Amino acid sequence: MAIFTLQPIFQQRIWGGQNLKTLFGRDVPPDQPIGESWELVDRPEARTRLVESGQTLHELWASADRAKFFGTAAPDTPQFPILIKLLDAQDKLSLQVHPPAALAPQCNGDPKTEMWYFLETSPSAKIYAGLKPGVTRPQFEHALASHTVADCFHVLKTAPGEAMFLPSGRVHAIGAGNVILEIQQNSDTTFRVYDWDRTGADGQPRALHVSESLACINFDDFAPQFAQPHADRIVTCQYFTVNRHRFDEPRQNGDLTISGRGFYFLFISQGAFTISGKEYARGTSLFITAEPGTLTVESRADRGELITVTWP
């Protein structure tokens, strides 16, 4: 197996901030609202580069050695099918929805199922996810017209270590004060149903997609709750599996076994670690190839935590 660090791709967003620098030492552009860092992505407009080799994720995916890098369970798709981001939401995001696979083509978009893992939250941080029990489509449309649609959403307070699974069709928004690791299908399709009547960087209201949103919203999706992890497993779905590995004692050791079935994306969410003899700080993202072997992991802090992503 081989371990590669990943070169992040920063995205300016009106709701972003500077927390990726403050928390993780990232070299983000100063005095700019950086809302997203694309950690692992294979899209025409953005392709992750592996620092040590200089190769892009797409070059590995398109190579004859795909199974060597991504494992025997890698699907036969034109692009690497998972997109992983860090989000710094210092203002609330739009109320939005992503299209289900059955509706995406007619909406001229790509389907997106995703999950959020909360890394840091302010005392007042919250999210909007799904509908309040009993909200109907006519009620939702009436609230849209009266600019009160946020009242239709189910609201949850957030805390570090919580996770929310968001299947396509679930209306949602991230509230202010959340720093999140997001794992999703490789899609950049978002339909905004409401954007709090604010303007974008150009002083104009950002585009809304009300008709597409209404077509895609699951109006039977009421009051979803945070994910309930089973042992190390946080979430698994048909697109990805996300695990959490906790180290509750200083200098605690552990092993991560690579079977050959799949790659690992590894994110250091708490503490610092020595992995196979090399030290890595909090906020580091690593790509670990699928060649069989065992990684020796040692926590270098009182408490440590790793998040890993691989195939389901």
Predicted regions and their residues:
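His/acidic/aromatic-lined binding-pocket segments of jelly-roll/cupin-type domains
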Residues: 84-85, 93, 114-117, 155-156, ...
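Double-stranded beta-helix
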Residues: 128-151, 180-222, 302, 307-312
